[in-house]
């Protein structure tokens, strides 16, 4: 298997059959080898810099009914909330003061936030903080909507594809949702010049090795600037409430493969990774990740944005989260930096 890992490192690509062999025949030794190699690649491209993104979860209303998600529309137990424009700008103000230069506006697909409202919020943030990057993560929209946000000043867009296999996608989502539509959205985002982020759940219900092969092949074809992966964690108020979580080892191995396949990618060590293991985010960085995303949302709403059970850091103030992550990264020889942390284009 080391031969395949070396090939992925050198050529940044494997065939479907090679990916299948690599994913189906793992050992502790090959996992560790891939993770150490990916950590070297991260250092070669980005040094020991770890980029922070200030996450603002501004609405937990959602029109979708994804079977794995705690803010799905059918969840009658979810305490719904929306931040006002003033709330969002105050989160940015606090974040800016403590060093954040990228803000991520994330929310469910909430019809209250029309294109006009989103455009106005984007414009105000970019007017007040012109040196900052702004990322949106608000789901599937039309090309016209994506263009309007881009023209207003949005720099990046996160839209996890969740699974690239159409049959698996149908098992995780209701019939009105389409994996092909999500892929189409990602291609439109790339075309419009966004730094684009895709990604998948690790260990989601009914996930097979074949599904994972499809994920890696799709990500190679899309060539996104960002990839977000994290372990599936069940939420008590969803149809998947009794399903087992994705594992730490799987997530770390797939992070490593992504770094080897897409050496310049911006790769978060997610909150979900920190939820399944106390040092999950540090281990993610040592497996090739180079982004962390502390929460800037008001503490009063943090516990309401529960996509999965047991989410960490719901009670800490933003400054505490920032300092805690800085200390954690320093202990593993890395430095949390306050610049925009843009994608580094590969030299031809």
Please report, for each region that a protein language model flagged, where it lies by residue.
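Catalytic cores of alpha/beta
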Residues: 142-149, 205-218, 275-286
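Active-site-proximal loop/turn and secondary-structure-junction residues that shape catalytic pockets
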Residues: 56-58, 109-111, 138-142, 163-165, ...
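Alpha-helix-loop-beta-strand connector modules within alpha/beta enzyme cores
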Residues: 113-138, 177-195, 243-265, 317-329
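Auxiliary Fe-S-binding modules of radical SAM enzymes
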Residues: 1-28, 96, 220, 226-348
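Conserved, mostly hydrophobic/aromatic
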Residues: 11, 38, 66, 105, ...
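Glycine-rich, proline-tolerant flexible connector loops at the mouths of alpha/beta enzymes
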Residues: 53-56, 76, 104-115, 167, ...
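Canonical Radical SAM [4Fe-4S] cluster-binding loop centered on the CxxxCxxC motif
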Residues: 46-87
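Core AdoMet radical
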Residues: 73-89, 95-116, 122, 126-186, ...
């Amino acid at each position: 298997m080391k031969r395949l890992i070396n090939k992925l490192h050198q050529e940044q690509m494997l065939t479907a059959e090679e990916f299948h062999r690599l994913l189906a025949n793992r050992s502790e030794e090959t996992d560790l080898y891939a993770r150490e190699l990916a950590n070297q690649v991260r250092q070669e491209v980005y040094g020991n810099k770890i980029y922070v993104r200030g996450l603002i979860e501004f609405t937990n209303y959602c029109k979708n009914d994804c079977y794995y998600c705690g803010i799905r529309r059918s969840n009658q137990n979810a305490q719904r909330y929306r931040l006002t424009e003033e709330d969002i700008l105050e989160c940015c103000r606090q974040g800016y003061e403590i060093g954040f230069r990228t803000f991520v506006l994330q929310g469910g697909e909430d019809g209250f936030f029309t294109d006009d409202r989103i455009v106005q919020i984007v414009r105000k943030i970019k007017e007040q903080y012109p040196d900052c990057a702004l990322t949106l993560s608000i789901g599937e929209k039309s090309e016209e909507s994506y263009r309007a946000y881009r023209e207003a000043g949005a720099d990046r867009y996160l839209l996890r594809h969740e699974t690239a296999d159409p049959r698996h996608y149908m098992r995780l989502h209701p019939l009105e949702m389409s994996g092909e539509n999500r892929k189409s959205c990602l291609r439109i985002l790339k075309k419009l010049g966004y730094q684009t982020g895709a990604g998948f759940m690790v260990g989601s219900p009914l996930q097979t090795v074949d599904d994972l092969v499809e994920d890696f092949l799709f990500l190679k074809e899309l060539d996104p600037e960002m990839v977000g992966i994290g372990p599936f964690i069940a939420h008590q108020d969803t149809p998947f409430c009794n399903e087992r979580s994705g594992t730490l080892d799987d997530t770390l191995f797939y992070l490593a493969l992504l770094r080897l396949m897409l050496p310049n990618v911006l790769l978060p060590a997610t909150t979900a990774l920190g939820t399944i293991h106390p040092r999950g985010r540090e281990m993610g960085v040592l497996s090739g990740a180079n982004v962390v995303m502390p929460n800037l949302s008001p503490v009063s709403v943090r516990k309401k944005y529960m996509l999965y059970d047991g989410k960490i850091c719901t009670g800490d103030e933003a400054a505490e989260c920032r300092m805690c992550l800085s200390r954690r990264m320093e202990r593993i020889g890395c430095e949390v930096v306050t610049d925009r942390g843009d994608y580094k284009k590969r030299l031809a």
